[in-house]
Design a protein with these regions (language model features):
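HotDog/MaoC-like acyl-thioester-processing domains
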Residues: 1-23, 125-190
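Hot-dog-fold acyl-thioester-processing enzymes
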Residues: 2-128
């Protein structure tokens, strides 16, 4: 005998597919300091990022930067902008700043509207990312990004309880409107 479950995927949630966050211009441009910090963090010491002669002879015909650098740049804030994590940490010093934290990255510009989840759905699991690189960013590029929901599906877990799989995509452009990369993200809600 199979257990009958009530669907948690409501018409309001289905209507979220295709919804977008605001289109946002990142603060600053791709520069040597962003490159240095990102290359040290991942670590990636490709000489195409700093050796002008070698880079000029490459297929890129000049210096380039790691293809995922736009995903880092958009998290930066101008010094004049309030950091929302300050307030979150006062309220809850153990907060990790995650998407369900009531602050932190959720308050970042360009975020998607919150899913209208039932009250019993409280857990969030990052299900992974996939990346589609169109072209490498260049020094001086001004990055713009926008997120959108691409699908929201209901699944049944091994315990017989329903959960949601929400997929979103973030597109990153340069100042010429050329797509640099697209990052698909899977979020699991239980």
């Amino acid at each position: 005998m199979t257990q009958k479950t009530n669907s948690i995927l409501t018409p309001d949630m289905k209507a979220m597919v295709g919804k977008t966050g605001e289109k946002v211009d990142a603060w600053g441009v791709v520069d040597e300091e962003y490159l240095r910090r990102f290359a040290q963090a991942i670590p990636d010491w490709d000489p195409l990022y700093w050796d002008k002669d070698l880079a000029q002879k490459s297929k890129f015909k000049g210096l380039t930067v790691p293809p995922l650098l736009p995903t880092y740049i958009v998290t930066r804030r101008a010094l004049s902008e309030k950091d929302q994590m300050d307030e979150v940490m006062v309220q809850d010093p153990m907060n990790d700043g995650g998407m369900n934290s009531g602050g932190g990255t959720r308050s970042q510009k360009g975020m998607l509207p919150r899913l209208p989840l039932p009250p019993h759905i409280k857990r969030h699991l990052h299900g992974g990312d996939d990346v589609e690189v169109h072209q490498y960013p260049r020094m001086g590029d001004k990055i713009t990004f926008q997120r959108k929901y691409t699908s929201i599906q209901e699944r049944i877990g091994g315990d017989g309880k329903p959960f949601l799989v929400a997929r979103s995509e973030t597109t990153y452009w340069n100042q010429k409107g050329e797509v640099l990369c697209k990052v698909g993200t899977i979020d699991i809600r239980r």
